[in-house]
């Protein structure tokens, strides 16, 4: 009976949780290595949910998903569609989302679109449970859940219902805010582009409230082919021009070896909020911009509006608005990775004040067999992991780590656990 159950539910070498750019890239490399990965998630879900009219901030040549043969890059998809993906010409986010779907159909095994609700330790390695209650057994797991679990909303706004406060990532379309007074919180690309789109979608009034003392804009990128002196002075990278960006882009492994305090400081300061060069003209429709301001309190008024207490350079003020959109980014905190079993989560070593999971060589966490990809690894590997560009560095190395861990497990059994882990977590062999 036990043998029959084991055959019906074999132990998988690798389960990939998440089907965004990182999850799909990891699955493509794993499939090419013969690991037969199982991948869960709706392909490019967060990208499909973005409002129409948004554009990629990154250059097309820095926006490839990763497969080992480099056969399914964004340039290949664009060529197949008769689209010119050129340096300095922004591409619609919808085009990039469709590219991810195309990549999924060609480079990875069939994607199981169910949501994984739990990854827990088990004798074989891990038990992976889906939304409908099915549990798979896996020797290794790659957690590539993207950014949506890590939404950051300013503290004074968190207690308000979603009817009054949303994160910018909640909006597939902005038509529902037409005719309303909307306050957008933040000064980065998401805030500035959301505000511009709201103005174009017929919002009655749009304002920006941001702690930043000024708006920062990226400059028009220089030509790809330049003279040797210009190239030497400010080399192109997938994260923008300049030698600092080149180090972030080309050497995430070196970033990981920096002292923890240095990594934390750079993570907080590198590639800070800025609008794309092509957005600046569109943003001209937004005239109410309040910089150097922070929200200290928020409440719903008797006439169904939101009252914001705001502190700024000239003292305190009160704003009333119909809706608040928090375009305030994401925090890669382990506490927000709810898909991980609580006991497993508490056993992981962390880095930085936000308690991101420590990510070791080849993207393995401190729990053997649990691998991490994407935003969760940025405090360890640097700012490139906040962007699609980082998938190219991650995918092949992570799969190399999986293969190494499987060999270390020996004989196809469990990959092992931290010392004392079985007893501490109540896992029975």
Where in the sequence are the language-model features?
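Flavin (primarily FAD) cofactor-binding/catalytic cores of flavoenzymes
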Residues: 2-43, 88-189, 193-201, 205-429
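Dinucleotide-binding Rossmann-like beta1-alpha1 core, especially the glycine-rich loop
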Residues: 44-45, 50-65, 80-106
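Flavin (FAD/FMN) cofactor-binding and adjacent substrate-gating region
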Residues: 49-82, 235-256
């Amino acid at each position: 009976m036990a043998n029959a159950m084991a055959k019906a539910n074999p132990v998988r070498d690798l389960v990939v949780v998440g089907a965004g750019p990182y999850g799909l890239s990891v699955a493509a490399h794993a499939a090419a290595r013969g690991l037969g990965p199982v991948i869960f998630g709706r392909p490019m879900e967060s990208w499909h949910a973005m409002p129409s009219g948004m554009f990629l901030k990154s250059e097309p040549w820095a926006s490839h998903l990763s497969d080992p043969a480099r056969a399914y890059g964004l340039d290949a998809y664009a060529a197949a569609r008769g689209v010119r993906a050129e340096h300095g010409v922004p591409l619609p986010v919808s085009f990039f989302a469709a590219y991810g779907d195309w990549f999924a159909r060609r480079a990875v095994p069939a994607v199981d679109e169910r949501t994984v609700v739990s990854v827990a330790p088990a004798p074989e390695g891990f038990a992976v449970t889906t939304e409908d209650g099915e549990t798979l057994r896996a020797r290794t797991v790659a957690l590539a859940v993207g950014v949506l679990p890590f939404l950051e909303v300013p503290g004074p706004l968190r207690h308000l219902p979603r009817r009054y406060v949303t994160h910018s990532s909640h909006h597939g379309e902005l038509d529902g805010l037409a005719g309303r007074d909307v306050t957008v919180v933040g000064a980065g690309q998401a805030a500035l582009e959301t505000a511009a789109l709201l103005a174009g979608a017929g919002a009655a009034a749009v304002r920006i409230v941001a702690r930043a003392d000024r708006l920062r804009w990226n400059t028009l990128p220089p030509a790809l082919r330049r003279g040797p002196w210009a190239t030497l002075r400010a080399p192109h990278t997938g994260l923008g021009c300049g030698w600092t960006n080149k180090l972030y882009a080309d050497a995430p492994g070196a970033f990981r070896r920096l002292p923890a305090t240095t990594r934390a400081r750079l993570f907080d300061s590198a590639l800070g909020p800025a609008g794309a060069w092509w957005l600046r003209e569109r943003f001209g429709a937004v005239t109410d911009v309040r910089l150097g301001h922070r929200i200290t309190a928020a409440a719903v008024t008797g006439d169904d509006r939101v009252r914001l207490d705001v502190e700024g350079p000239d003292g305190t003020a009160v704003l009333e608005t119909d809706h608040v959109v928090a375009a305030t980014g994401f925090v890669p905190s382990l506490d927000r990775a709810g898909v991980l079993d609580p006991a497993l989560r508490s056993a992981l070593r962390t880095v930085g004040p936000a308690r991101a999971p420590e990510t070791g060589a080849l993207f393995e966490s401190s729990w053997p067999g649990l691998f991490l990809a994407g935003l969760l690894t940025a405090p360890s590997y640097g700012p490139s992991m906040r962007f699609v560009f980082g998938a190219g560095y991650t995918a092949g190395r992570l799969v190399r780590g999986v293969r190494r861990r499987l060999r270390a497990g020996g004989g196809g059994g469990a990959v092992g656990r931290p010392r004392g882990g079985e007893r501490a977590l109540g896992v029975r062999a």
